[in-house]
Regions:
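Beta1-alpha1 glycine-rich phosphate/pyrophosphate-binding loop at the start
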Residues: 22-34, 42, 74-75, 107-172, ...
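Short, well-ordered loop/turn elements at secondary-structure boundaries
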Residues: 111, 183-184
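N-terminal processing/targeting junctions
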Residues: 120-123, 181, 195
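Short, well-ordered alpha-helix to beta-strand connector turns
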Residues: 125, 164, 184-185, 206
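A conserved short coil-to-beta-strand element within the FAD-binding core of flavoproteins
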Residues: 168-182, 192
Length: 211
């Protein structure tokens, strides 16, 4: 019984366990090694709607916990990730069996939190409208991840544009405008900047608000 308790056969690999998103790193690397970057990217897309942004900010804790890396036989997983998101072909999601929810969501403002929230709401099929002061998709991406290379920012803007989301660009996000649009939605979310304007005495929850 003691030996059985020590068995790790059914436990996740160290790299997978170290990943905050619990991505199947081994499977992703397997397909990358085979040259199937499309399949590798599909695995990465399971954990994020914007792989280039996540990859750019990833600190790769998987590498620190990889046993092969400890022996000097590991690979730079982060660099493999970069190659996958740049050269992999994005998958096309089927609309079959994807039923739109009845409740409508509204997001006010821009930044990392509103961007990823929009991606997650779209994935869950909530009709979502984003109201922002930016003039186009690329500037909206830049507001969330201005550190991205121009080519990567452009690719993420294309990804955002292809999503089933409604955008109202160039909005004047004043209180009267926001309150008017809030009446049209069942769920309302806001960037930290807009939230401070709506409730100046409330502090942002740093546990959920990505900065």
């Amino acid at each position: 019984d003691h030996m059985i308790s020590l068995c790790v056969h059914e436990q996740p690999a160290y790299c997978v366990a170290a990943c905050p998103f619990k991505m199947d790193t081994k499977e992703m690397l397997y397909y990358a090694a085979k040259g199937n970057f499309k399949k590798a990217l599909a695995i990465y897309e399971k954990i994020t709607p914007f792989p280039m942004i996540l990859c750019d900010g990833c600190t790769a804790p998987c590498e620190d916990n990889c046993k092969l890396c400890e022996l000097g036989d590991g690979v730079s997983i982060r660099e493999v990730e970069r190659a996958i998101v740049r050269y992999g072909e994005p998958g096309r999601r089927s609309s079959v069996f994807r039923m739109r929810k009845k409740k409508r969501a509204a997001i006010f403002g821009s930044g990392l939190f509103p961007l990823f929230l929009a991606g997650e709401l779209e994935k869950k099929m909530y009709p979502t409208t984003i109201y922002c002061k930016e003039e186009d998709y690329e500037s909206y991406i830049a507001a969330a991840a201005g550190h991205l290379l121009e080519s990567d920012r452009s690719n993420e803007a294309k990804r955002l544009k292809s999503m089933d989301l409604s955008f109202e660009f160039g909005c004047s996000l004043n209180l009267s405008f926001i309150r008017e649009k809030m009446e049209l939605a069942d769920v309302v979310c806001a960037s930290e900047e807009v939230a401070k304007m709506l409730a100046p005495e409330e502090a942002a929850d740093v546990e959920i608000m990505l900065r």
